[in-house]
Amino acid sequence: EAEPKPFNPVCYEPKEVGPCKAYVP
């Protein structure tokens, strides 16, 4: 987590775990 990753629409869903958690608003 050194730098913020671009928003990933594929991760636009409620996830409690995984890298997608950083993408959900």
UniProtKB/Swiss-Prot annotation:
Keywords: Disulfide bond, Protease inhibitor, Serine protease inhibitor. It comes from the Eukaryota. The record marks K21, A22 as: Reactive bond. GO terms for molecular function: serine-type endopeptidase inhibitor activity. Signal peptide: none annotated. Residues 1-25 form the BPTI/Kunitz inhibitor domain. The keyword Repeat does not apply. Serine protease inhibitor. Inhibits trypsin, elastase and plasmin. Does not inhibit kallikrein. This is Kunitz-type serine protease inhibitor RsTIS5. It comes from Rhipicephalus sanguineus (Brown dog tick).
